[in-house]
UniProtKB/Swiss-Prot annotation:
It comes from Rattus norvegicus (Rat). It is possible that the segments of clustered carboxyl groups mediate the strong binding to hydroxyapatite. Monomer. Interacts with integrins; the interaction promotes cell adhesion. One of its GO terms (molecular function) is integrin binding. It is found in: Secreted. One of its GO terms (cellular component) is extracellular region. This is Integrin-binding sialoprotein. Residues 177-188, 249-261 have a biased composition (Polar residues). The gene is Ibsp. One of its GO terms (biological process) is extracellular matrix organization. A motif (Integrin-binding motif) lies at residues 289-291. The Arg-Gly-Asp (RGD) sequence serves as an integrin-binding motif and is required for integrin-mediated cell attachment.
Length: 320
């Protein structure tokens, strides 16, 4: 009995101490001061209880409850809503039938705004894929009725684009023949093997123009070479020349002379003379600055023999 009483006393003291400490901890956390300055969320419940989470705040949704149900007229309001929906559908069907022509014109306008890139052959599938983003969602019946119209408009646009591409390619070929006729396309024009070889009259005119241009360029090349300039190969009808140095009044730098200095009879040192003309200074008597320490001795000779602590406070800044 004595041992049992002793054990009970010890257990009661331990439990009282632990509970006192537990209540003190909760009181400290719930105090007004700690709630403002020392916010520590209570994690011991979430640590030991796996699925214990604080309750979520439920905000009331504005306009979510039906006013008709509150008044007790829910059935009548639903019937009225169904009647309004049916009447609206009938009106929309009539408007859609009346406005088919206007929508088709608007679609053609929007489709013509998008054109294929230059140099890429357009096909029906590619055109449909590119213009899929511009097509508005329609009903199944409208889509079936407008399918032939869409196909016709697509075919017309493809034909126009092909004609424009052909015209642009023809213009580009003509420009290339005029520009590069002196160097590359002279044989093609004579033989009639160019991209537009069907028109013989135009080829003859282009050949005469290119011959005249070739004569002018050869004469200019001869004149330039007679003056001593170097001419490059004609690139796209343009000449690349380098002007003579006398035009800018510049002279080439003198070549360095190699000298051989004999050091006794053992070996010879062969190299270029070191020209120090560009490194000379008037105050250094023609010697390059930095080879010796003499230039720096004059600047730092004041500090020889004593350190920075000998200036006695701020006297150094007032007696410079």
């Amino acid at each position: 009995m004595k041992t049992a009483l002793i054990l009970l006393c010890i257990l009661g003291m331990a439990s009282a101490f632990s509970m006192k400490n537990f209540h003190r901890r909760i009181k400290a956390e719930d105090s007004e001061e700690n709630g403002v300055f020392k916010y520590r969320p209570r994690y011991f419940l979430y640590k030991h209880a796996t699925y214990f989470y604080p309750p979520l705040k439920r905000f009331p949704v504005q306009g979510g409850s039906d006013s008709s149900e509150e008044n007790g007229d829910g059935d009548s309001s639903e019937e009225e809503g169904e009647e309004e929906e049916t009447s609206n559908e009938e009106e929309n069907n009539e408007d859609s039938e009346g406005n088919e022509d206007q929508e088709a014109e608007a679609e053609n306008a929007t489709l013509s705004g998008v054109t294929a890139s230059y140099g890429v052959e357009t096909t029906a599938d590619a055109g449909k894929l590119e213009l899929a983003a511009l097509q508005l969602p329609k009903k199944a019946g409208d889509a079936e009725g407008k399918a032939p119209k869409m196909k016709e408009s697509d075919e017309e646009e493809e034909e126009e684009e092909e004609e424009e591409n052909e015209n642009e390619e023809a213009e580009v070929d003509e420009n290339e023949q005029v520009v590069n006729g002196t160097s590359t396309n002279s044989t093609e024009v004579d033989g009639g093997n160019g991209p537009s070889g069907g028109d013989n009259g135009e080829e003859a005119e282009e050949a005469s123009v290119t011959e005249a241009g070739a004569e002018g360029t050869t004469a200019g090349v001869r004149e330039l070479t007679s003056y001593g300039t170097t001419t490059a190969v004609l690139l796209n009808g343009f000449q690349q020349t380098t002007p003579p140095p006398e035009a800018y009044g510049t002279t080439s730098p003198p070549a360095r002379k190699s000298s051989t200095v004999e050091y006794g009879e053992e070996y010879e040192q062969i190299g270029n003379e070191y020209n120090t003309a560009y490194e000379t200074y008037d105050e250094n008597n023609g010697e390059p600055r930095g080879d010796t320490y003499r230039a720096y001795e004059d600047e730092y000779s004041y500090y020889k023999g004593h350190g920075y602590e000998g200036y006695e406070g701020q006297d150094y800044y007032y007696h410079q």
